[in-house]
Each structure stands twice: as C-alpha cells, then as structure tokens.
Amino acid sequence: MSASDLEWLADEMTQRLKTPRGTMRLRPIQALALYELATVGGLFGILRVGAGKTLISFLAATVLKSQRPLLIVPAKLVDKTKYDKELLEQHFRLPHFMRIMTYDWLGREQAGEDEERGKKSALDEWAPDLVVLDEAHRAKNYREAAVVRRLRRFFRAHQNARCAAMSGTMTKRSIMDFAHILTWCLPAQLLPIPTHWNELELWSQALDEKKSGFGIGNIDPGALETLCADAEDARLWERTDDKRHAARVVFRRRLVDTPGVVATVESPIDASLIIRARRVELSAEVDAVFAHLRQFWELPDGWTLSDGLEMFRHARDLALGFYLKWEPRPPIEWLQPRKNWHAFVRSKLKHSRKLDSELQVRKWVGALKKHAATKERKLDTEDLQAVECLDAWLAVRDTFKPNTVPVWVDSSALAIAAEWAHTRPGIVWVENPCVGQRLRDEFGLSYYGEQGRDETERFIDAHDPKKSLVASIASSGEGRNLQAWCNNLCLDLPPSGARLEQLLGRTHRDGQQADEVEFEFVVSCREHFEAYQQAMADTRYIEAMTGSPQKMLLATHAVAHGVGEGRGPRWWSNDRREQ
C-alpha cells in the first residue's frame, strides 16, 4: 500500500474500532496489521520497538470476534499490560475480558499436562480460540523450551485456533527462531518457508548468521536463487559476490510480501541515536587476576572454567571489578551427579515430543523403575543408565544448597558509572544484580531490579525523569517506555543484536523529546568489545532477513579505532600465556 492508502486505512479502521468518546487514532502500521489479521485470520508482525504492539494485541480479539482470547506476555510486563488496557479501553472497543498468561508461568510444571492425574495443560483447559504472542521472540527456542513445546502441541491439536505473533526482534541468528511461529500464524498454503523439516534445515544452513550442529557449517546458498521473484531480485543476485547476503534479501522480500505478514520498513523516530564506546582502565590488581584467568582458566578462588562460554562470562564480570564465588563450594560428590543428570535431561528433552520439563523427565524415569520392579517391562541398557543417573542425583541432591556471592576486586568501573550518573539524568544498565545493588548501597543511586521495581516496590516508570537510575537489563530491557531519558550507560553490553535492539528501544522510541539519544557502553576487556562486534553481526543478519530497520545500523557509531585492543592480560586471547 502507498502512504496515502495507509493513512486512509488508519482513519477507516479507527472509526470502526474506537469508542464514541475515543480521541486516539490508530497508526498506519497498526491499522495494516489489524486489516491483515482480519483478512488472513492470523498475523506475523515484525514490528519495530514502539510501533504500538500492545494496542494491536487487544484489538486482535475485537477484529476476529474472539470468544476466548488469550494474551501471552513476559512476566515483567503483566502490570504494565493491565495499566495500558485501562488507558486504551477509553478510546477503543477492547474485549471485555482477555485472559493473560506469562511465558514464564506457561513453561512451568503447573501449566503442563499430567496424564496420571488426568489434568489438562493450562492451554487445553482455557481452550483459547485466539492466542496473541506479545514479544513473540520469547517463543523462539523450538527444541528445548517447555513453553514452545506446549504451544506447538496446542496448535497441532486445535487447528481452528488463530494466532497473532508480534516482536521487534523476531529472530536472533537463525530462520529456526521463527519458522515454527509462522506455521502457527498462517495457513499452510501461504507459508513462505518449507514445511518439511529436512528442507527447512537446508534453508537454515544457507541463510543463518551462525550454523553449528552435527558438524555442519553454513552451506552455499546458490540453490536459493530460485526464490528470486522478479527482475530486481535477479539483478541483485547477479551483481553481488556475497550470495548469502543476496539470498537473505531475496528471502526477506518473499517473507514481507506474504499475506498475514506485516513488517515496519522505516524508523520515523525524529531523535538521532549515537552509540559510543567508553574505555575504562582498571587497577593493577585486576590485571593480575586477569593474567591468572587467561593462563590457567581459573578464578581467584581456584574454581576452574570448562569452556569458552564460561571464560566469556567471567571475564566480563571481572572487567567490572568482581567475580562470583560458590559459598560454600559444592563438593565433587554433589557436582558430578548434578552435571550428569542435567546433561541427560537436556538430551531427553531435545529428542522427545511429549516431555517438556525436568520434572516430567524425572517422572518418566520413575515410571521405568516402577515397570522394572513389577517386571512389566524389561529395561534396556539406555533405560538402566537413565535410572542410575537419576538415583545418583537424588541421593545427593538435598545435601548441598547452591549459593554464589560476589567478591569485589576493584570498584573503578562502578565509580565511573556513578560519576556519569551524577552529572546528567540517565540510565545505567547492568546485567548482574550485585552491580546494581552496590551502585545503590555505596553510591546512592536508585536500582530497579526484579519486575522493574526498586527496594520500596516503586515501578521504574514512576522514577523522576530529572534523576538518574540503575536498571536491570533482564527486568527492564524490553517492553518499558523509558523515553523520558535520553542518556544511557551500559556496563555489560549484551552480545546479541536482538537483545540490544530491545535495549536501545527503551529510550530511542516514539515520544522521545530530545534531539539526540546517547548510548554509551563500557569497554574494559576484550570480551566487552567482542560483544559489540557480535551484536553488529546479528543486526546485519536481522535486517537482511526481515527488512525491519535495526537501530544499531541506523545509529552513528562513535567507536574509536583500537578501543577493543590494548596491552595487558585484559586484552589477551584466551590461549595466550604472555604479554
């Protein structure tokens, strides 16, 4: 549709959906999403942060005349969602009742099916005729997440149930992040992806940012030239040497042209976005700890690291001046059975269609033991190993209670963050709660942690915009309207383009009054800069695949050359043994 057509559609849909005294108007992208939903019967919305997904979520039930609508949101956004509904129902004809569940609760054992007791799952018990997935990227983990398994089983069993899924970050690095969600939203004849798993896996290997599984890396995307729909696609394919990028662009056009798929293709926010790297130097004591970490893969308390992911995580913590210590340290007699059992559970969930939680795997193994005791079934070697694994874990499980405490080596990074916060109103973003708690206790800053609340239970939205605050990335990094601030300092940049897009969108969004939004991130070790590089690679992939403008690519990057390099152990590679 042209811009004028979209404006006409917004006026028309507003008149049909507003209350007699309503004064709000649908945005063109909201009107288009609701129109596609009504026409196709489902919606796959790749809608940028701040596009108005909440209103679409509520009006979806009105448009489809749903009798039993269900809205699924992250737990931290429940209160905000209820508040928004009270405001929006003054202007639009929202459903009188819309059941709200959270991804967190839906993934718990209580929400699952219990065949022994004849208990239905939470989804089957409510039996919604419409499921709205807000922040739908929470349902992307196809193989392992219990909530995804339960949603998948529900849609297979209830073919007439409709689905509207929306997110500004629908994918992270793979087509597999959203392929299953597409099948819930659209009828089979409209799907822009293969429905056969093996063929979809080949597409994934050709298109994905990173592909690692079964020893197979990315494959040549040449076969996807068949996706070229017109002369423009063909010219793009012929002009570029980067066939993988061309395949992503061609796929993106195929995706966004599919009926029922709506994607924002522009970012009309007036404020510019500037991303800066802030180099932070630490004490000689931290460098000494880093030297030991790099050389021996060992924390100061003697705890050894097993893989590169652990090194990446602990190095980023240490570069902020602390490390996490088991207090007390778990005995090997407890740790090894726990490790073995968790490895077995992960393997079982990955290959099972019926089991979707650790407790269900435990019950399944318990049933094996019962069959063996009554001689109803002879156990094979694999079954016996499962029983032995569980027995070994249950024998020691309650003998130790895990507990970690932060050990501080240096507070230079925190002092710099506090000085920054006291010189301008802004948000200091932290990943680990202990960092936020110390900034609160030692430097006098308000810290909004779990559920976006401070120690007095005040919501982050109610904080004085003239004062700085510290916010948890996990609790407030998505779904919050924080455009009252335009300055950001991130102490621990997420190494994910999807998470960073959400984080940038808290302050760089509609309603921002400042001319510029500044987002600084701390670089005090090599891993901090690697997180930035990975996020950049992710955002290029996301924009190429979905066409949704990514803030990281629209921003001005004031990142000095060499900011991620230096002398000393904080900048060594993990296999280096000398300076």
Positions of PLM-derived features:
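Inter-lobe coupling linker of SF2 helicases/translocases
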Residues: 100-107, 118-127, 140-168, 173, ...
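Conserved pre-motif I regulatory segment
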Residues: 2-44
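Walker A/P-loop NTP-binding motif
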Residues: 35-41, 53-67, 185
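A conserved SF2-helicase RecA2
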Residues: 495-504, 508-579
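Conserved Helicase C-terminal RecA-like lobe
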Residues: 3-9, 24, 38-39, 56, ...
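Conserved Walker A/P-loop ATP-binding site and its immediately adjacent core
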Residues: 54-59, 65-88, 174-177, 431-434
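SF2 helicase motor core recognition
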Residues: 47, 52-54, 108-110, 119-121, ...
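Conserved helix-turn-beta segment of the N-terminal RecA-like "Helicase ATP-binding" lobe
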Residues: 76-98, 185-188
